[in-house]
């Protein structure tokens, strides 16, 4: 199996093991990482980036650690997943404070991580706009602030993201 196939299988199992489903649609959670990986694959990318796209929520949402990712997929994938993992915790403060901390973290990330983050933003924004228009107003403002720091991400995805969030 390729690293991308291994990442897809691993992420599918990790999210299923905790019973995670997509908010609003209740589909198996892997639908989201699959969409993110598919978006990454539409622009210049590496297999490491696509693997990280599949794995980007495993550390935040499942029992998987960065060490587990490193052991299974190596340092490059683990580094990208680490950049893509939110660093804020509930005790850091309200949502605005937490999102600011997470923006500061991803602002320092390399181009590959920021490209995956743009794909994640595109996928999540479309879903939230379709299923929760009231929350979308708050969410899209947060994403507009996030776009300000994703300066190293892929330009094509940046343009798509800006179009979606209404910038």
Question: Across the structure, where does each feature detected by a protein language model lie?
Answer:
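Active-site helical microenvironments for divalent-metal-assisted chemistry
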Residues: 1-167
């Amino acid at each position: 199996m390729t690293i991308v196939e291994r990442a897809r299988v691993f992420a599918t199992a990790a999210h299923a093991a905790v019973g995670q489903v997509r908010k609003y649609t209740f589909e198996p959670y892997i639908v989201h990482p699959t969409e993110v990986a598919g978006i990454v694959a539409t622009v210049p990318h590496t297999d490491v980036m696509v693997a990280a796209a599949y794995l980007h929520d495993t550390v935040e949402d499942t029992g998987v650690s960065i060490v587990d990712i490193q052991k299974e997929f190596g340092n490059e994938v683990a580094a990208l997943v680490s950049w893509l993992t939110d660093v804020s915790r509930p005790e850091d403060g309200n949502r605005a404070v937490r999102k600011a901390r997470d923006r500061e973290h991803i602002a320092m990330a390399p181009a590959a991580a920021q490209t995956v983050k743009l794909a994640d933003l595109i996928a999540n924004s479309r879903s939230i706009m379709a299923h929760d228009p009231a929350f979308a107003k708050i969410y899209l403002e947060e994403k507009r602030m996030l776009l300000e720091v994703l300066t190293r991400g892929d330009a094509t995805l940046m343009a798509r993201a800006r179009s979606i969030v209404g910038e």
